[in-house]
Amino acid sequence: MNDFPDPLSQLYCKFGRTVEMAQVMEFEAGNFALALISVMFDPEKINNEQRRMFKSVIDDVDKRTFGNLLNLIRKRVSISEEIEETVSQALEKRNYLIHRFFKKHNFAIHSEEGRHAMNIELDDIYRTINLAHAVLSAMTHTLNQAFGWPNISQEETLELIRKAKTG
């Protein structure tokens, strides 16, 4: 059941797709933060206290905003200026998308020209956020490879912790 005119549906679809990419990027920042912390553990010698601490860290990462995660990462590692700029631009555009995009365009959504401008802007925001996601993903993968950790998702990490508790 779609009561929106087709061009409006397309705009909302593009907005949703861009917001989804922002969430994927945030999730990858969390994966990188967890990868940074995981290098402190030897998976062959992890004890229950370390498991609880790691679970606590995962819970903390889940509650952080993207900006807070970036600050956590910046405290732990030195990041090149190019990467810093890429990720900072994505953070800025993510915040604009979530908090100000529709407010800025206000009545523009009601005209073809306005929707066109909004679509162009959403494409730009998507590209910026997608690039930051790719950079964060590559950083996570590289860190995991450097320390011999498998590249697994947060869900897989939680499952390993659950298995270790019951195993």
Label every PLM stretch briefly.
Residues 1-8, 70-78, 112-113:
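Short, charged/polar, low-complexity loop and linker segments
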Residues 10, 17, 82, 86-89, ...:
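Alpha-helical initiation/capping and key positions within long helical/coiled-coil segments
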Residues 7, 14, 79, 83-86, ...:
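Residue-level recognition of alpha-helical structural elements
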Residues 1-64, 88, 138-160:
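Amphipathic alpha-helical interface elements
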Residues 110-130:
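Short secondary-structure subsegments characteristic of cysteine-rich extracellular domains
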Residues 37-88, 92, 96, 100-107:
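Flexible secondary-structure boundary motifs
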